[in-house]
Design a protein with these regions (language model features):
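Conserved ATP-driven motor cores of ASCE-family P-loop NTPases powering translocation/secretion/packaging/pilus
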Residues: 258-361
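P-loop NTPase motor domains
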Residues: 1-266, 281, 342-363
Length: 363
């Protein structure tokens, strides 16, 4: 792709993270906050940093897309989302690396900052986070975003902080830190405007790292939506996400990729082994919505016991064929009739030679 077609390449290798390119989730946030620091009058840069911080916090705290599903606990997750946004913005604004130093503003730093603030002994009835927020100007956005947590009772605030810590705890992995603590050579804005390809390699033997793949896909797609909205609702280049083994990834808010992505020139190609994987991860309704939003379906290579073959045989529909019988005897007779038959029966689908596929297209 790089040598022949001239693509800019990034390889995020979760199987061997020490050989992987970086993928710092705070790259765009840091970049725009640095631009605002250089030119305080550049309000647009600050607004973009805040927007990307909100996208990241929502992706981490509410991967399913909506805190309402948590019922009475929705307050804690919404507050945790605002709190994490504030933490990320504080890191981006006040902890830039000095000349010659490596980037130290990343998601692990966010965890350490929360942990350090919780460890600070109370001063005049306030914890470390409240003391830090008091140092900010009253109009600072980080202070506003964390307002729900700051104004709640001590026990409620502790629950909000614990929610943030529990979500960030998943990133504490020595190998994984070799990826998420270093900037990516490709960010969402570059990905949408240049010839770029990102290869994401998952370790089949260690499904614990699959969550980071789902997180990267979800965060990148939301950033691409934001980029598209700044350019009349369409990306400059068409973006295609080939998601092999999507059925083995943890469920995430995938439905907007189908419903909102198409109009923005962003296409998702989910590759699964069985329709049952979608139903297991997204429920019956979610699986139906995903299938209904796929304009083209390519399938083949079914196992002998596959139930997916039955479902796809029904989806192919039927045709009318002429059927009958002929009897030979003293009085020869024949009987012909028109009957309905599946276009391809499940047995016929299962017997398709390896390497051959059936394609169903819309229109």
């Amino acid at each position: 792709a790089r040598d022949i077609y001239g693509y800019r390449i990034s390889v995020v290798d979760l199987r061997e993270p020490t050989r992987s390119d970086g993928n710092n989730l705070l790259t765009l946030i840091n970049r725009y906050m640095d631009k605002h620091r250089e030119d305080p009058k550049d309000i647009g840069a600050k607004a973009k940093a805040e927007k990307y911080a909100k996208i990241l916090a929502k992706t981490i705290i509410n991967p399913d897309g909506d805190a309402a599903q948590y019922g009475e606990n929705a307050f804690f997750y919404d507050s945790a989302e605002g709190l994490l946004t504030a933490i990320v913005l504080l890191l981006a604004e006040f902890a830039p690396p000095k000349d010659g130093e490596p980037e130290k503003r990343h998601i692990v730093s966010a965890f350490k900052l929360v942990q350090d603030l919780l460890a600070v002994p109370k001063s005049r009835g306030k914890n470390g986070f409240q003391v830090l927020m008091d140092e900010l100007p009253p109009e600072h956005k980080a202070r506003w975003l964390a307002g729900a947590a700051l104004t709640s009772a001590d026990q409620s605030m502790a629950s909000v902080m614990s929610t943030v810590m529990s979500r960030l705890n998943a990133f504490l992995d020595t190998e994984l830190e070799q990826v998420i603590c270093y900037d990516s050579p490709i960010n969402a804005e570059m990905f949408a405007s240049e010839k770029c390809a990102i290869f994401l390699i998952l370790p089949e033997e260690d499904p614990a790292k699959n969550f980071i793949a789902a997180l990267m896909i979800q965060n990148l797609s939301r950033e691409l939506f934001s980029v598209a909205d700044e350019h009349d609702g369409r990306l400059k280049n068409r973006v295609v996400l080939f998601c092999d083994e999507l059925g083995t990834m943890p469920p995430f808010d995938i439905l907007p990729l189908f419903s909102a992505g198409r109009s923005r020139r962003l296409t998702l190609v989910p590759i699964i082994q069985s329709l049952a994987q979608l139903e297991k991860n997204y429920g019956k309704e979610g699986a139906e919505i995903i299938c209904d939003n796929c304009q083209d379906t390519i399938f083949g290579g079914f196992s002998p016991q596959s139930k997916t073959a039955d479902a796809l045989s029904a989806a192919l529909g039927s045709r009318t064929v002429l059927s009958g019988s002929v009897s030979q005897g003293k009085e020869s007779s024949q009987s012909l009739q028109m009957m309905e038959r599946a276009l391809m029966t499940p047995d016929e689908l299962k017997s398709i030679p390896k390497g051959e596929f059936v394609v169903m297209k819309t229109g």
